[in-house]
Amino acid sequence: QGVVADIDGNYTLNVNDGTYTITVRYIGYKDILLNSIKVKAETLLNFEMESDAQALGEVSVVAKKNLEGERALQMERQKATLAIENLGAKEMSIKGISNVEEGVKKITGISIASAGQLIVRGLGDRYSTTTLNGLPIASPNPDNKLIPLDIFPASTVQNITVSKVYDASAFADYSGAHIDISTKENVGSDFLSINFNAGGKFNTLGKDFYRMDRDGSLFKTPSLDQKLIDMSLTDFEEYARHNRLFNTSFQVSKKTALPEFGGNIGFGKRFTLGGNEVSVLGSIGVSNDLQTMDNASIRTLEATGNTLNEFNYDSYSNELKIAALGNLGYSFRTSDHIGYTFFYARNAIDTYMRREGVDYEDHHLIGSNNVTHIYSLQNHQVNGKHYFGKQWDLNWSGSYSKTSSDEPDRRQVMFIREDDQIKLFKLNRQETMRYFGSLNEDEWVGDLTASYRFGDNNKLQAGFTYKDKNRDYMGTRFYYNLNKLNPTITDIYDTDSFLNMENVENGSITIDRKKQPKDSYTAGNSIYAGYIATEYYPVAPLLVNLGVRYEISKQWVDYYTDGGKAERSELNKNDLFPSLNMKYY
């Protein structure tokens, strides 16, 4: 039985007559323990408590910053040794930004070209670099150095940080901008979120939408039967005469554009395991996008200004985006943390185009073609942060990325308009064709960094980084010889009446496979790097960041010449990269 005294120390305890043990406690005072106290009616007991002279030598408060908000990111900019700009998830949500590409556009000095290439101070795509949680990620597009930034939806992003200056801790392959995408982690309370949206574009919703025959949905990546690639040319020609080679035709159907749909499910949970903290976060989102473009035009010019060809076209694009994020964190011994992050993204774009115009020889041509691009990224990361007292800390991280770019079953049929009649265009066999191409890239990265703090705000940092990248590409073409085929054509969308298996079997159509050695290559790149850098205040308001990086780089590519001769090209370099950045507060 017990009672709490009021602010003046008065108390009343109702007990029966008898002998009791009484304990008195108060914060900041020594406990009082009285044994064998005899209590009768209206007994008065007063206690004089002595102050507890013990004092806390140090109080440590451990917390994790939530780097999604503007205020936290502003503090990061102020403390940063480099000139950086950043954009957090909360600001992206307020501004209605749906992916990283749209977010980067909001940062001063950066623009995105029509082809999706990043432009920084007039410098193109190959002058910049992209990292995910500080580790490099490869591009699935061989034409671009940077991965398409619209592959990262805002729902999986904690913040975007852009640095336009060089730092010795980063790979020395950029002079434009370093874009780091930080994925979300659970640093707050438990949550479960479900979002759903629907919409449409004024020039698309409810309008006619054309689509060439497709093998399944955009959730699936169509593939070519491997035996069609491996068999000899003689065996292929015989096989093609009597067997259906592809799961699709050149037939075009017309539908009505439906509303676009999207949704995201996310959850976060924090709990203790063996007295240590564990955090879990997961998120998956799916969205689709429909886009039509009517009466557009394209013209190709020579350097002299002469027109090579000019076409008007209508295009119909269907895009599917999938992104998934998983994060697992484990904190122990107060100042140590290890984590695992998984990120998956898939962008599939299917575009049908009908174009009509004239070529260099004044042929009046009509083209019906379909292109499907499927980009995917799978990234696994592990990381650890360890603090040893107030001066030393050790950070390590590693990642494995697998990116792919597939162009399955690109198809084209060309027609010519002559004397108000539409005929098959047979100037060369490339006018009616199919193409299958795939590019796969695997990348391993490891990083180890140790830091030593001295003085009030000075720091010395040293690290080692390793990167190994391998890329494989292969393309196969199938050309349709239509010289024996002369159908009556009234509708270019209806091709099943003449581009069919019956005409292949009777010899009116011949399908040729072109799989030349020059249509494939294998490449690789290995980098070993070490660096040392310091952040030093010579005087209070002046911060000097001085560093040097040494890289051993080996690059190679195995390819074939037009004549089919195997070649290897190598580039081995040892480079020294100094850096100096100063900041005056």
Segments predicted by a language model, with ranges:
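Flexible glycine-rich, low-complexity coil/linker segments exposed to the extracellular/periplasmic environment
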Residues: 204-256, 423-430, 474, 479, ...
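Outer-membrane beta-barrel translocator domains and adjoining extracellular loop/strand segments
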Residues: 205-209, 292-299, 351-358, 407-415, ...
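Periplasmic N-terminal accessory/gating domains of Gram-negative outer-membrane beta-barrel systems
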Residues: 10, 38, 66-67, 71-120, ...
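Structural signature of Gram-negative outer-membrane beta-barrels, strongest in the C-terminal barrel
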Residues: 331, 343-346, 372-383, 389-391, ...
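Periplasm-facing N-terminal accessory domains of Gram-negative outer-membrane beta-barrel systems
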Residues: 1-62
